[in-house]
Amino acid sequence: MFTLKKSMLLLFFLGTINLSLCEQERNADEEERRDDDEMDVEVEKRFLPMLAGLAANFLPKLFCKITKKC
């Protein structure tokens, strides 16, 4: 009977550790997903002003060539 209790206690202990490790991995995965979303927002913020700047430089030249009023 004592050996049965000992093995059940060991299984319970190992199961608890296993669940704890799984929870830590799950939390780490969720944090990585959040970081990716934040990085996408930062890339969009950097990309749009650059695109607007290029358009501001390119559109007057294009308009000038199309209308031939340079």
Swiss-Prot record:
Tissue: Expressed by the skin glands.
Disulfide bonds listed in the record: 64-70
CC per GO annotation: extracellular region
Pfam families, alphabetized: Antimicrobial_1, FSAP_sig_propep
Compartment(s) of residence: Secreted
Propeptide residue span(s): 23-46
Residues in the signal sequence: 1-22
Keywords linked to the UniProt accession: Amphibian defense peptide, Antibiotic, Antimicrobial, Cleavage on pair of basic residues, Cytolysis, Disulfide bond, Fungicide, Hemolysis, Immunity, Innate immunity, Secreted, Signal
GO-annotated biological processes: defense response to bacterium; defense response to fungus; innate immune response; killing of cells of another organism
InterPro entries on file: Antimicrobial_frog_1 (IPR012520), Frog_antimicrobial_propeptide (IPR004275)
Role, per record: Antimicrobial peptide with activity against a variety of Gram-negative and Gram-positive bacteria and against fungi. Shows strong hemolytic activity against human erythrocytes.
Family: Belongs to the frog skin active peptide (FSAP) family. Brevinin subfamily.
More info: The primary structure of this peptide is identical to that of Brevinin-1MT2 (AC E1B241).
Protein name: Brevinins-ALa
